[in-house]
Amino acid sequence: FANADEAWQRAAGVGEFAPATQDWAAIEAAAREEGTVTIYSVSSRIAKLVDSFQERYGIEIVGYDIASDLQLEKLRREHNAGVHTVDVLFNSESSILLNEALPAKLVWNFIPESVSDELTESEKSPLLIQRHSSRIVYYNTMLNPNGAPINSLWDMTREEWSGRTLLPSPLEDSLSANFIQTILANPEDMAAAYQREFGEPLSYSEAVIEAVENIATIDKPNASIEWLYRFLQNEPVFQGSTTKIFKNVGDIAQENPPIGITTFSKLRKNKKGVYAAGPIYDLDPIFGVTYPTALMIADMAPNPNAAKLLIRYMMEEGFSPWNEPGDYSARESVEAEQVKEFDLPSFEDLKLWPV
């Protein structure tokens, strides 16, 4: 990563040059002069803001729907080539952001004062969190009227679920990889869940024991490794689209529906008489894996004031495209409204592991 340009930092008012108070009249006036704002967005729903933002501020949003990891690779390459066209990143690849992009000053945090009091410290630093999303397990509610057909992650290793668990390929989908990696990071919980499910301590497969002996970085087998081995032996089906997974699980015109690991907010895709899928809330040991989606200013952004204005907008009324069941606003008041409107548990009441 190239070093950030101090003159730009000073002009943009970021980092150590951020003013003590935010003059929004001045920011808005400067943003209108800039006239456009370019955003790399992990969500295609950014397109829903184009007209309303243009109407309110006279500023054009140029949005690109790009996966989080690819956003950062694109930004890095452009930055190193001296090409600076993007203003805002809307990104959920927290590990790369925290370990690479932020330390290299490739992106800059910005917290609109109007929402600061509604956020926890971890939602303001090191980056501004707009919402909390999750990867969870869905089942077909229409064809399982008595409730979820599984109650443990270990059920996915049973023969009856061979070839019947859908998920995005961890080799192609970074959030799917994060889901698996997070399970791997919690072996004690997985061991306890095994004992609850089968009534006896876990015994490791010979293949796992042999594999671990040949990996210098792993001391000994554990329950998470064993789960992953058995899960992969049970032939899960990798599909490229999280929406496709949801629909394949929820399709009511089938006899033997699969279960699927996909995005919690796909709940909005349910359609009466067509799709009926629901979350497995009481899955043992964990309901799912949660990850934040953050907003930030790109280093050397050509339109830093429009970037600030768009970030504030996406935290306030511009949150509406993401005001869907399963996407929890970081803002306390908005989340409270969501819980009531969507009849969902509060975010803090869900059994979720952070990536």
Give residue spans per PLM region.
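A ligand-binding cleft/hinge motif common to bilobed small-molecule-binding domains
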Residues: 95-100, 250, 257-278
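Periplasmic-binding protein-like
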Residues: 117-120, 131-135, 227-231, 274-299
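Extracytoplasmic ligand-binding site segments that recognize negatively charged/polar headgroups
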Residues: 40-51, 62-76, 84-250
